[in-house]
Structures are given as structure tokens and as C-alpha cells.
Regions:
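Carbohydrate-active catalytic/glycan-binding domains of CAZyme proteins
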Residues: 1-187
Length: 187
């Protein structure tokens, strides 16, 4: 099991690593270990949007900002402020792109792996992951049959996709839920 995110330099032809790398976001165990890193640059800053490790169950994304590809990265506060489920709107960000011809429009693309289980909130299963991976866990959480069914139900062929614009306040990146939006609404 990995415990940190690694940024590695690639060779000029992008077919190998150079041997130079940096490590970020160390965490001892799931669900806090970061994965599914989406990198983008904006106004000279490097951004990494990451997911926790809860299988196909969604969890809170983290946004981090640095001056260089190798950091150090500063994790910002919650980037999904209106998401009461703490599941990044029941999705996992996989990529971010800047829209050509727009002044400052970046779109976060995310996979919604478990669309049949959007009623579940992160706090309901966070502690189950901690119980299974934290060797010092001393809580008394009981296995939740519905969560177990979700973990075993890995039918990702029914996945949905979520595309949302990223809103910036200064350097911080925020993703707000919008039932609908149009590129024409942005400069």
C-alpha cells in the first residue's frame, strides 16, 4: 500500500523517469492516503487535486498549490464548500483542463463510480476504512451491511461523469455544484 504521492521527472521522450522525484501528502493508511492526482497550472502555480483511498466509494477531494511541480504543496481548506456529503459530489476528479478561448475557465472532470449509492455520506464509511487499516484503531464501529454491499458491487460500467467549472478566490480553487452550466456564461 502506498502512503504518499510521488512526482517524478520524465525523460525528454516521456518513456522513462530520470530518477529525480519528490514526495507529498504522507498519510499512514486509508482513507487518508491520496490517489487519483489531477495536475494543472494556472498563473504560474501548480495545482494537484487528489482523492482519498476508499475504493469506488467517493471521499473528500483535496486541492494543493505550489510554485513548482515538485512543491512544496500547501493543502488548502475544503475545495467543495457546498458538498454536505463530503464526497466531492459523489465523484472522483480524474482530470482538469483549461478551456481554450476563455479567460480563466478550468473544468474539473470526475468519475461518479457508484451512482446507485449517492445517498451515502462519507462519515458513514470513513471510520470503517480506518478500522481496517489503522493498526492503533480503538473505536467500536460495526460493519455496515449496506456499505459492504457497495464495496463488493464494483459495476463501474454504470459510472456517470461530472464536469464542473473551477472557481478561484485568489489562488484557492473551489468546485461548486451546478445543476447545469454553459461555457458561454464564462468570459
Amino acid at each position: 500500500m502506498h502512503s504518499e504521492t510521488i512526482c517524478a521527472d520524465l525523460t525528454a521522450d516521456y518513456t522513462d523517469v530520470t530518477g529525480y522525484y519528490s514526495t507529498h501528502f504522507p498519510h499512514p493508511y486509508p482513507p487518508y492516503v491520496r490517489e487519483a492526482t489531477a495536475h494543472f497550472q494556472r498563473k504560474g502555480k501548480h495545482y494537484l487535486l487528489t482523492s482519498g483511498t476508499t475504493g469506488y466509494l467517493p471521499n473528500p477531494s483535496e486541492a494543493a498549490i505550489a510554485d513548482t511541480w515538485h512543491g512544496p504543496y500547501q493543502v488548502q481548506e475544503n475545495s467543495h464548500l457546498s458538498d454536505e456529503s463530503h464526497t466531492s459530489y459523489h465523484s472522483q476528479i480524474s482530470s482538469v483542463f483549461k478551456v481554450h478561448g476563455k479567460k480563466d475557465l478550468y473544468i474539473a472532470m470526475a468519475d461518479r463510480w457508484m451512482p446507485k449509492h449517492m445517498h451515502l455520506q462519507y462519515e458513514r464509511y470513513r471510520e470503517l476504512f480506518e478500522k481496517n487499516f489503522n493498526p492503533d484503531y480503538s473505536g467500536n464501529v460495526q460493519m455496515d451491511e449496506e456499505i459492504l454491499k457497495c464495496v463488493l458491487d464494483k459495476n463501474t460500467s454504470i459510472a456517470d461523469y461530472v464536469w464542473l467549472p473551477i472557481r478561484f478566490e485568489g489562488e484557492n480553487a473551489y468546485i461548486d455544484w451546478l445543476d447545469e452550466w454553459r461555457g458561454e456564461d464564462y468570459e
